[in-house]
Amino acid sequence: MAEYKDNLLGEANSFLEVLEQVSHLAPLDKPVLIIGERGTGKELIASRLHYLSSRWQGPFISLNCAALNENLLDSELFGHEAGAFTGAQKRHPGRFERADGGTLFLDELATAPMMVQEKLLRVIEYGELERVGGSQPLQVNVRLVCATNADLPAMVNEGTFRADLLDRLAFDVVQLPPLRERESDIMLMAEYFAIQMCREIKLPLFPGFTERARETLLNYRWPGNIRELKNVVERSVYRHGTSDYPLDDIIIDPFKRRPPEDAIAVSETTSLPTLPLDLREFQMQQEKELLQLSLQQGKYNQKRAAELLGLTYHQFRALLKKHQI
C-alpha cells in the first residue's frame, strides 16, 4: 500500500483534476479507460477507482496484456478446462473469474489481439465467458478498467483495434498528465522518496537537496515519469551515503561513468578572459569559483574541499567567509 500512496502525491492542478474525476467515476459501475505514459501511475489510479467504489471489499485483479502471447493471454483472462491444450492438466480459473465481484485492471490493452478483443466485448456486453476448451457459459460480475498509452482511435482506423470495444470501454477516459507537466510536484515527490530511502537504509535524516540538485531534477524531462523519479532519487540518496551535507549529485544515468572527484573542467577554469579587465575583480571571481568547485567535488565536506585546494581547514574557512559562501 506504500507505493500506492507514494505515486498519488501531488498538488498540481492537472493532477488534482484527475483525482476529482476519479472520485466522480468510482461509484459508477461502468468501464473506464486510463491513458498515460509509462510510470505515471495508471494501475494506482485503477486501484483508486476500485477502492472508492462499492466493490472495494471485492478483489482487485490486474494483468499486463503485453506480457503474454495470444494463447496464454486467452487462457489467463478467461481460464481453461483440464485437457484444453497440451500441459493443461487441471482446470484453471481465469482473471475474470478471480475478479468476480470486484475489478479487473488490464494494462497495455492495445497489445491484445483481435480474438481476445472479441471475447472482452462479450464479457462487457453480456457478463459471460467460456473457458478455453469449455462449452458452458459462465456468468461473471466484474468492472473492467483498462489502460494504454496507444492512440486507440488511430488503431481503430488502421483496423488493429475493434471500434465497438473502444465504444464500450470509453464510457469515460482518464488522461494522466506526464510528470514534466507537473513541475510543482517534482520536488514534493523527490523529497518524499528521499526521506523514505533514508529510512530504508537506516540514515537518521535526509539533509535536503542543493540548489544545483533541485535544478537538475526540475530541468530533466522524466520520460519514465514518477517511476523514474523514484528510482533516480533513491539511487542518488544511496550514493550520497552518510554525508550530513545536502545532496548535490543527482545520478540519472547509472551506466554513465562518474568523473574522478579531483577532475576539474579545463574549459571552466583555464579559459582566458578578454582584455582590458579589472585584474583584482577577475582574481576574486576565480577564487570564488574555485571555492565553490572544491565544495562540490568534496561533497560539501569542507576539510576535503580544503585539501583539494592545498589549503588548511582554517585558511579555507577564512576564504569562505571572505566570499560570503
UniProtKB/Swiss-Prot annotation:
Annotated Gene Ontology cellular component terms: cytoplasm; protein-DNA complex; transcription regulator complex
Residue range(s) of DNA binding per entry: 302-321
Keywords per UniProt: Activator, ATP-binding, Cytoplasm, DNA-binding, Nucleotide-binding, Transcription, Transcription regulation, Two-component regulatory system
Location(s) in or outside the cell: Cytoplasm
UniProt keyword Transcription regulation, yes or no: yes
One GO MF term attached to the UniProt entry: DNA-binding transcription activator activity
Pfam families the UniProt entry points to: HTH_8, Sigma54_activat
SMART domains xrefs: AAA
GO biological process, one term: phosphorelay signal transduction system
Residues annotated as binding ATP: 36-43, 99-108
Span of the signal peptide: none
Residue runs in coiled coils: none
Presence of the UniProt keyword Nucleotide-binding in the record: yes
Sigma-54 factor interaction domain: residues covered: 15-237
Activity regulation behaviour: ATPase activity is inhibited by interaction with PspA. Under inducing conditions, the interaction is disrupted, allowing activation of psp transcription.
Disulphide linkage map: none
Function: Transcriptional activator for the phage shock protein (psp) operon (pspABCDE) and pspG gene.
NCBIfam families: phageshock_pspF, PRK11608.1
Name of the protein in its database record: Psp operon transcriptional activator
Originating species: Escherichia coli (strain K12)
